[in-house]
């Protein structure tokens, strides 16, 4: 942890953080939630595996003792047809998680049975498997039976669950009374997690069908908004987020999503973003992502101290969130001139999410600004290994090579222009690149 981060965390502990019996703060458990193996079921029932993962995610989001690591962080290891013990172990290590939650489904004497499992990290490399009690789910009672599963996992992982927390978790884990609507929702979420234009369009169709079956399905409205946002349908996304808040004014996620929209709006809507993030935090004080958003909004308004305070709370509630370390990396260098703290924050973000292009770009820019051109080239090159068409990395690499190898810089500018000239948003930058290219060619002729 950086020196400044240590000082930041020395403040008063925010409400909602779990305490041990001795009164010391207990870090939340970082968990990866995997779809349950449903290959033993008939094809039309296999959506239940993803459905259980969604139930666990919704329920555990209501407890301050857990932070969830996005399944997208596992893309480097691929997506197996079913997550068994070997896949769970690989997921645990890849995500640097404290535990992975998974399991399988089968039918016994015609009745559906859920077989929940978990794998905990012990020490540096050891693991401890946990097997929970089988959960029978008679026909017509699946959603009711699954609602208690998040609290059961919490207790199995030795995380205290007070009665109000258990009630809140169970309520969140039972978002609709219609199994048909929940099936569409689970299938839609599975499609959106696969990513890509076609899968997101499939997700839109499935989530819309979930809402047709149950118009009061708040979580489905929110999820539909998220997918619309991914597709670039900004206004449709906003409509779904607002529908969620109208159906359930206590649901925090859409307020945070609206904050994100305000932050990315063409106009400067930072005050509205602060209001939306603050509302999400009011509803769920330990909502780490909302604290990060609030920090970003305050930083955009020029309130550096307010931003740092928000990031501080985000770190307490979720110390393994790469986004907060990314934001700290930006503010340390740009606003406070703290080189070492910035580098360490960016490196921590990359350690937590090796595919974070933004963190690698930020680290490269800090190195470049300090004249560490070899290190900057290394970071920009890693960005291009992950995304060969990343125009920011192509542009920055060309600039850096101007300092160390003009001939290579010419090749880099030519490559940037080939890629970026097809993109309207890059037009002004392409014009600048052509000026650099002409200047370099003239210099080499002399």
Show where each model-derived region lies.
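Helix-start (N-cap) detector for alpha-helical repeat units in TPR-like alpha-solenoids
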Residues: 181, 218-219, 252-253, 288-289, ...
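Catalytic-center loop of serine/cysteine hydrolases
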Residues: 54-55, 59, 66, 72-190, ...
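Structural signature of tandem alpha-helical TPR/SEL1-like repeats
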Residues: 198-205, 230-243, 264-279, 300-313, ...
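Position-specific recognition of the canonical hydrophobic site in helix A of tetratricopeptide repeat
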Residues: 192, 229, 256, 263-265, ...
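Structural marker of alpha-solenoid helical repeat scaffolds
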Residues: 213, 247, 283, 317, ...
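Alpha-helical segment of the N-proximal tetratricopeptide repeat
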Residues: 179-213, 230, 260-264, 296, ...
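A structural "domain/chain start" motif
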Residues: 21-63, 175-181, 185-192, 215-218
């Amino acid at each position: 942890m950086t020196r400044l981060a240590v000082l930041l965390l020395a403040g008063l502990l925010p409400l909602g953080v779990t305490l041990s019996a001795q009164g010391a703060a207990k870090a939340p458990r970082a968990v990866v939630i995997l779809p349950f193996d449903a290959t033993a079921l008939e094809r039309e029932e296999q959506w239940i595996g993803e459905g259980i993962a969604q139930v666990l995610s919704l329920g555990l989001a209501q407890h301050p003792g857990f932070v969830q690591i996005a399944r997208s962080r596992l893309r480097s290891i691929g997506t197996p047809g079913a997550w068994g013990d070997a896949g769970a172990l690989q997921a645990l290590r890849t995500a640097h998680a404290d535990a992975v939650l998974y399991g399988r489904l089968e039918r016994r004497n015609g009745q559906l049975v859920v077989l929940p499992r978990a794998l905990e990290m012990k020490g540096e490399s050891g693991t401890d498997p946990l097997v929970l009690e089988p959960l029978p789910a008679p026909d017509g009672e699946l959603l009711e039976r699954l609602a208690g599963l998040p609290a059961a996992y919490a207790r199995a992982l030795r995380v205290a669950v007070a009665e109000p927390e258990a009630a809140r978790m169970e309520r969140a884990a039972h978002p609709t009374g219609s199994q048909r609507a929940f099936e569409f929702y689970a299938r839609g979420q599975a499609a959106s997690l696969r990513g890509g234009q076609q899968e997101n369009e499939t997700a839109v169709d499935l989530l819309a069908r979930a809402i047709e079956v149950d118009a009061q399905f708040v979580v489905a409205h929110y999820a539909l908004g998220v997918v619309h946002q991914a597709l670039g349908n900004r206004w449709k996304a906003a409509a779904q987020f607002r529908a969620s808040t109208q159906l359930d004014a206590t649901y925090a996620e859409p307020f945070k999503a609206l904050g994100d929209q305000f932050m990315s709006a063409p106009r400067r809507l930072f005050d509205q973003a602060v209001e939306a993030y603050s509302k999400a935090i009011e509803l769920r004080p330990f909502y780490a992502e909302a604290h990060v958003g609030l920090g970003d909004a305050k930083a955009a308004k020029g309130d550096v101290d307010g931003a740092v305070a928000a990031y501080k709370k985000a770190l307490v509630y979720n110390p393994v969130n790469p986004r907060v370390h990314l934001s700290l990396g930006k503010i340390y260098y740009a606003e406070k001139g703290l080189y070492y703290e910035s580098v360490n924050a960016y490196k921590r973000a990359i350690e937590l999410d090796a595919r974070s292009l933004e963190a690698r770009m930020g680290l490269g820019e800090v190195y470049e600004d300090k004249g560490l051109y070899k290190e900057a080239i290394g970071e920009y090159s890693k960005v291009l290994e992950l995304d060969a068409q990343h125009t920011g990395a192509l542009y920055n690499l060309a600039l850096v090579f101007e300092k160390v190898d003009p001939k290579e810089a010419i090749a880099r500018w030519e490559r940037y222009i080939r890629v970026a000239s097809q993109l309207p948003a890059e037009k002004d930058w392409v014009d600048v690149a052509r000026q650099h290219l002409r200047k370099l060619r003239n210099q080499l002729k002399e």
